[in-house]
Design a protein with these regions (language model features):
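Conserved, well-structured interaction surfaces
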Residues: 81-153, 184, 201-204, 363-370, ...
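Short coil/linker segments at helix-helix boundaries
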Residues: 152-192, 240
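Hydrophobic-face positions in mid-chain alpha helices that act as interaction patches
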Residues: 237-376, 408-415
């Protein structure tokens, strides 16, 4: 009987020891990378504060840059039909509105987590790296909300934006299941974007990355500010930040169209030309995004979406081959023209990159790289701001600088 009692005591002791060991095991984070407790982890986390699902394909199909060239071109799908017709999307893919919404809010969540983590590490005063990381986080949060409010709401205007429905502005990491958020209004969203933008501008730097153009840096922040304030109808601010971005010699900052003019534009050579266009060493590229995207295929020498295209009619009557205020001179970077199995007039801009998930089976995802912010856009934003302010001479100076950089014309525009 005594032996049996000792056996029970020993069994209970071992069981309690096991439970204690189990508790210790469960109290330990299985992957310490999940705890953002160092500068390096904060900086790594900010890599996910940029959306990997682009809005540019839908935006291009929604625009006047794409036309319906008829059923003789069979390259289409329900997705392309829907976005061209501005119809309700009934399916989801990497560039659907559902993915855009989710991906940009996911990027915002990462930015918010980085902001919380930096505060837990002592704040931006702790080190230059954390200070610049905080600036990047604020800018990422501002940029993602800016894209969302312009994709899903009416454009800002002083007359109606205080009553136009906005989007939820997320400033903290999510901590509850299925919470309810208020959309607010567009004016409120813009005010919050400006608040984050100003904070980010004061802190952002260029020192945390070996290739800073895949992250917000000083020049990219200035270019974003110029774009934002153009939409916000604060035109003096556009000029202020465009000046900071472009410097005293804007011509040295613009895209190298003389170099692009020497590169081949036929379909076999599409890839090197597009890769040069998004090269981080090019001065014009201020912020580069990578994305799961068919842009390089839908706007390339492929039959994808061939029913809807930028073709000969648009080129000759509306844009790159039509008469312009400076005449009908040619662009230095001549477009590729296809008029057989598809009707396309294309400038090589987005590379077609295939990411294999199974090289043996030959399956994976199409991806691309694109300039989210560039000096050429910044210059045109400044020109538009000058127009709004009635300074037509300065506007023409900027427009002439842009035209002579990309076009062979000798003519100047005057007020």
């Amino acid at each position: 009987m005594k032996t049996l009692k000792i056996t029970y005591i020993l069994a209970a002791t071992f069981a309690l020891a096991g439970l204690s060991a189990c508790n210790k095991f469960l109290d330990t984070t299985p992957d310490n990378r999940a705890t953002v407790d160092s500068e390096e982890k904060v900086i790594s986390l900010l890599g996910s504060a940029y959306s990997e699902n682009d809005h540019i394909l839908i935006a291009e199909f929604y625009s006047d840059n794409v036309d319906n060239y008829g059923i003789q071109y069979t390259g289409t799908s329900r997705f392309f039909d829907s976005i061209y017709e501005w119809s309700e999307l009934e399916e989801s893919n990497n560039e659907s509105t559902e993915r855009i919404w989710g991906s940009y809010y996911s990027a915002i969540a990462s930015a918010n987590q980085a902001i919380i983590a930096i505060d837990g590490l002592g704040g931006p005063e702790t080190s230059t790296a954390l200070s610049q990381a905080l600036g990047e986080a604020y800018l990422c949060r501002a940029y993602s909300h800016f894209i969302l409010v312009n994709m899903f709401c009416l454009q800002y205007n002083k007359q109606t934006s205080s009553t136009d429905l906005g989007i939820p502005y997320m400033t903290k990491p999510e901590t509850t299941l299925a919470p309810h958020y208020e959309r607010g209004n567009v004016a409120d969203v813009y005010a919050q974007i400006e608040e984050d933008l100003v904070k980010g501008l004061a802190l952002v730097g260029d020192d945390n990355y070996t290739v800073p153009k895949y992250h917000f840096n000083k020049l990219a922040a200035y270019a974003f500010a110029a774009r934002f304030y153009l939409f916000y109808e604060k035109y003096d601010e556009v000029i202020k930040y465009a000046d900071l971005c472009l410097g005293s010699s804007p011509s040295t900052m613009l895209r190298d169209y003389d170099v692009l003019a020497t590169m081949p534009n036929g379909s076999p050579q599409q890839q090197p030309t597009t890769l040069h266009y998004v090269d981080p060493s090019v001065n014009a590229n201020l912020l580069l995004f990578t994305a799961f995207s068919v842009m390089g295929q839908a706007f390339g020498a492929y039959s994808t979406a061939s029913m809807y295209s930028h073709g000969a009619y648009l080129a000759k009557n509306e844009d790159c081959q039509a008469n312009q205020p400076w005449g009908n001179s040619a662009y230095k970077d001549a477009p590729a023209v296809y008029n057989g199995s598809m009707d396309r007039v294309i400038f090589w801009r987005c590379p077609r990159i295939f990411q294999y998930t199974d090289p043996v089976a030959g399956i994976g995802f199409l991806r691309t790289v694109y300039p989210a912010l560039s000096t050429d856009e910044c210059l045109l934003n400044r020109a538009e701001a000058y127009v709004h302010l009635g300074d037509y001479n300065k506007a023409c100076e900027d427009l002439n600088l842009w035209v002579h950089n990309c076009n062979t014309t000798k003519a100047d525009m005057t007020p």
